[in-house]
Amino acid sequence: MKAPRVTLDQWRTLQAVVDQGGFAQAAEVLHRSQSSVSYAVARLQEQLGMPLLRIDGRKAVLTEAGNVLLRRSRQLINQASQLEDLAHHLEQGWEAEVRLVVDAAYPNARLVRALS
């Protein structure tokens, strides 16, 4: 049986824990209970089959793998946000492409360099 897929919400939760410095602080920022934040991160680690955080005193610290995956998850969340923005713009009737009109007298070589 295939393992359940990790959700964007789980990545956002991990980011909040790291950015806020702990589970309680992340829960406050996310407007969720601390137990739901802890569960989301524990489930994420379980689904990935590796620890992303280790507890050092009262602070959650990223493991090496956690650090690598957190960086990539930030890109993923940013791309997902951009995709949602694009969908919203398309729904509003915005063009999905840019049209460039250039006078025939403009040197083609310059145009090609500028667009490269």
Where are these regions (language model features)?
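Short alpha-helical "packing" element that flanks the helix-turn-helix/winged-helix DNA-binding module
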Residues: 10-17, 69
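Interdomain hinge and pocket-entrance segments immediately C-terminal to HTH DNA-binding domains
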Residues: 88-108
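Residues within the DNA-recognition helix of helix-turn-helix
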Residues: 33-36, 40-43, 114
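A short LG(V/I)-centered, amphipathic sequence patch enriched
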Residues: 45-64
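The N-cap/first-turn positions of alpha helices
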Residues: 7-10, 34, 66, 73
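Short helix-boundary/capping micro-motifs
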Residues: 17-31
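Alpha-helical linker/hinge and terminal dimerization helices associated
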Residues: 47-48, 69-91
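Alpha-helical residues within the helix-turn-helix
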Residues: 28, 46, 67
